[in-house]
């Protein structure tokens, strides 16, 4: 989320007439990417130090509200976009005489918590309450809600006129494009249950029976690393499925593969699929909610597979392995499709959205 926010802020700041601010609560370290013409304000609330427990959290939340309210009344912005961190607890109750346009960004599919396997009843109840809090109780004071995919809007926000769709942009660029000739498939992400890499390892077991000279690279770190290592060993896939660890150059690694695979149970908008397209990779993905359906046109730039259908997933991978011209054709189609996620285009779409929403808000005020 931090990377996407910085990339969008930098792009918006380059547009004539804009003044852009990023407000944070505890800037413990420099931004992960340099800011270009963007004001950075640290409210110095530091939620995770000094105070512990519920009482401490409420004190921090009150301090956060006071400092944010004071800042916004000083700079008097036309538009305020909340990303849904701690400010969601009080944002709609801020006293702002200048009446800016209040927008809430939602970065996750509404029911993503339900997709996590092997959780206790207590966790399920807690997750249900968190979903009600995030998606019902605390969004009523915003002028508009911005979500990532048309699929999410159709599934979870039907009939809500103030819900709009805006995809995230590609946050990095790579000059190298895949030749789609190397005998390597690739996937990336945190090694956590939601990404379901264990399913992908089982899928690759099927693939390896027909194509033992191909291998799968899994890039990322996380809590399931030891368990996945054990699964690979027990499946006899050592050397055919490789846990590669962390990389600071994900697009470069993608450009050295021939297809991208996604096995997640849930996503918001899987940026990795867009990044993979941007280096010319064909895609094979579960049709998890949400995102893959917005990105992949089945049979054109990749394949969509029902979640859990490991047999069909393996068949689609084998189809790409066995048909190099098809791999290259789909990779080229994805490369062209990725153009609409360029940050320059996304920034202009945000500007058009701001203009339209501000004009409507002004019209409503004048008609009173």
Regions of interest found by a model, annotated:
Residues 246, 265:
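Aromatic "clamp/platform" in nucleotide-sugar-dependent glycosyltransferases that forms part
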